[in-house]
Amino acid sequence: MKQGARFLKKAAGAPANVAAAINRSGGRARLAAKVGHDPFGEFLLHTLEAEGIECAGVTRYATPTTLAFVGLQDDGERDFTFCRGADGELCWQDIPADFLEDVGIVHFGAATGLLGGELYVTYQRLLHEAKRRGLLIAFDPNYRGGLWGQDPQEFIARCTPWFLQADIVKVSEEELSFITDVKTSTEGCRRLHDAGFSYVAVTCGRRGTWVSHRDGMQELIPSVPVDVIDSTGAGDAFIGALLAKIVQSGCTLDYWQ
């Protein structure tokens, strides 16, 4: 990052990426978030609305909009630097009373949501309310060392209750490895199922996605071959498309449990 000479502004944030992928896959997404009263916040709101995302749960705050700087490497991989801001101030009073009405799945990401503070409290209350209503819960740990430090143990401890509450868990190969302390997706998923996880999708880059259900079903679904330019948001696009198709398939909560 310190060698960078050019910066290109892009709308992002994992939950917003997922919401956009849901809409582009034929679903309907609504988002709870908080942005600043600044040009970046205005840009994000405009982009969300252009994607057709329901934004009644997106509010403004005096704190500047959270920024993520992504440094691209030659192989398409990234390094991240974060400037936390308004996203951490999302409070329960910002969530519309009807936010969970006519909703099939509630998706949570952990990049900043589990760091603590007001956003963390709101996350917990929203999860509790979604479970009370019997809604399907999806969770993506979305580990970023720049937010949690290089020792993932605190991150794992924060994520574990969410893993156990989720019906669908999406992880990368790297996340699965350090969460379970094993190297293979087969054994890693088995450990998660033994701990109570229902359905796990492991994104494996160009090789595809390893899907595993605790009833014993495991399968590698190949990816469509592409030339990798920038992998930022690839996992978000995947889980967004998956969630849209799950709703469209009409699968019930009992199936995922």
Regions found by a protein language model. Name each.
Residues 128-129, 181-257:
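Conserved phosphate-binding/catalytic region of the ribokinase-like
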Residues 15-24, 123-129:
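Histidine-anchored nucleotide/phosphate-binding helix
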Residues 105, 111-191, 197, 207-208:
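Conserved beta-alpha-beta core of the PfkB/ribokinase-like small-molecule kinase fold
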Residues 28-112:
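Conserved N-terminal subdomain of the carbohydrate kinase-like
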Residues 10, 17-28, 72, 245-247:
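Alpha-helix C-terminal capping segments
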